[in-house]
């Protein structure tokens, strides 16, 4: 768990099990540098969805700027294109910015959207238990604001959340 978010992403987006790859394999750094791969984004595009990826970290982290188009995403918005970014005391971007970015992606197209968003606020190392609790509280507020925004829109939404980091 942790120290391999790109591999967790790969498994979730493609439904491929990394056990079938070599030890220490990071498809984002190897096979996806030059090849495309079937994914939920490609499948939903075939059904008429616009596909967006959003990440409040640098585009070059795990080469996502190269990989996301090869996984079927029409657009990718990394932190370099976000305004009013706030960082937590350990330097990670706060997740609250993501609600605005998700809403922009929803507003950018007519019809159905698939928006895959990766957050970073909860990344360790945690200097103290109270710091960890504060970050969880802020992330909880972000999720509440995101749900409120989605509920105010006229289109139906499905929100799926998962994590790959333990405290």
Task: Name each model-derived stretch.
Residues 1-167:
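Solvent-exposed soluble domains appended to multi-pass membrane proteins
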């Amino acid at each position: 768990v942790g120290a391999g978010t790109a591999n967790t992403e790969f498994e979730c987006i493609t439904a491929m099990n990394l056990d079938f790859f070599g030890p220490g394999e990071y498809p984002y750094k190897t096979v996806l540098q030059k090849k495309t791969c079937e994914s939920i984004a490609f499948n939903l595009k075939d059904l008429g969805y616009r596909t967006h990826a959003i990440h409040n970290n640098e585009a070059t982290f795990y080469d996502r700027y190269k990989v996301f188009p090869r996984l079927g995403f029409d657009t990718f918005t990394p932190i370099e294109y976000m305004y009013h970014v706030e960082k937590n005391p350990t330097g990670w971007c706060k997740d609250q910015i993501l609600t605005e970015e998700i809403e922009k992606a929803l507003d950018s197209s007519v019809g159905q959207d698939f928006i895959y968003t990766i957050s970073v606020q909860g990344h360790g190392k945690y200097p103290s238990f109270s710091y960890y609790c504060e970050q969880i509280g802020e992330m909880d507020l972000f999720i509440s604001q995101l749900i409120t925004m989605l509920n105010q829109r006229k289109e139906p939404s499905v929100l799926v959340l998962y994590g790959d980091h333990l405290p």
